[in-house]
């Protein structure tokens, strides 16, 4: 599958659900939001915030951590990490509609000083070498067909003593060059 195809697929269309949930909360258009109010519908992976708490504990994520999330979706994990740990997060999302919603929700949670959202293809973006202490991804890497480039990019931007945490589908066969 080509990355261009992924960009046009609309892999997940949760945007309407988010705005419907906000209407149900009486917070459809304005005013502050809390991370807890969003966490039941902005986590696009299994086990919601429990999965993030597990990563926080395993990796000892704290306010000194510099985190990059690959495939950040609506920004739920990034906001939760920032709120719970005080860490700074760079959240990369390929789909523009998800990115736009993530930016909007992060601003409403007043976490835009802790979470930087970037819309783009992780394989094409440039990040500082040896910069991040933690890379995370929940159910996103299997959408990236060029795993060799993906992993090489991760190695380049991760500090030598850093951690790479992934929850994803796995294939039980050897990887090829793609």
Each model region followed by its residue ranges:
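N-terminal, positively charged/glycine-rich alpha-helical extensions of SAM-dependent methyltransferases
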Residues: 1-36
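Class I SAM-dependent methyltransferase Rossmann-like catalytic core
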Residues: 36-46
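Conserved class I S-adenosyl-L-methionine
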Residues: 165-178
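A short SAM/SAH-binding and catalytic strip from SAM-dependent methyltransferases
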Residues: 133-146
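Conserved alpha-helix/loop element of class I SAM-dependent methyltransferases that forms part
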Residues: 45-63
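Class I SAM-dependent methyltransferase SAM/SAH-binding core
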Residues: 66-70, 74-124
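A short acidic, Gly/Pro-enriched loop at the edge of an enzyme's catalytic core
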Residues: 125-135
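A short glycine-rich, Lys/Arg-flanked "PGG" loop and its adjoining helix->strand segment in the class I
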Residues: 148-163
């Amino acid at each position: 599958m080509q990355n261009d195809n992924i960009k046009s697929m609309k892999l997940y269309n949760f945007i309407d659900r988010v705005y419907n949930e906000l209407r149900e909360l009486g917070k459809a258009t304005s005013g502050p939001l809390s991370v807890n109010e969003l966490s039941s519908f902005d986590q696009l992976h299994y086990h919601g915030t429990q999965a993030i708490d597990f990563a926080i504990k395993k990796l000892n994520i704290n306010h000194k951590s510099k985190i990059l999330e690959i495939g950040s979706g609506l920004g739920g994990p990034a906001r939760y990490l920032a709120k719970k740990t005080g860490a700074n997060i760079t959240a990369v999302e390929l789909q523009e509609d998800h990115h736009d919603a993530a930016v909007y929700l992060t601003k409403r949670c007043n976490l835009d000083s802790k979470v930087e959202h970037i819309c783009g293809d992780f394989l094409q973006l440039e990040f500082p070498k040896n910069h991040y202490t933690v890379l995370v991804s929940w159910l996103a890497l299997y959408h990236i067909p060029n795993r060799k480039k993906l992993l090489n990019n991760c190695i380049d931007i991760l500090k030598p003593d850093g951690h790479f945490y992934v929850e994803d589908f796995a294939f039980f066969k050897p990887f090829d060059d793609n």
